[in-house]
């Protein structure tokens, strides 16, 4: 059976890991399908980009918009939870964009399976420390983005994936 997880990167990885565990424990196909559908509905993915340059190169935005956004230091804030890329806002500095991610996490209530995803973000460990009041540091996974997502997101992209309760 094919199930659309509406997820990517570590969000998808969490679903696969839990489904594999259920299969290993002897879960039936129906039980595993129900588990995957439940996890998919509870998976959240948010990210912030550090530059608009890669969006311009990939044809996702025009040159004028990229130039203006770069001049104003816009950092796009994205919600990928629905399986589509949705602009959830924009911030003017890196610090504000990371604070936006923290506010998203704080607004969710109880969360689990938190992963930080990044593309060579030098401040990833600092960000992990900042959110350790929300999820203990030893429960936070940090993962480098793959080539495809990293190509679109560009250097210093940083995001979070997690499950809501």
Could you say what each language-model-derived stretch is?
Residues 1, 7-165:
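Mixed-charge interfacial surface used for oligomerization/domain docking
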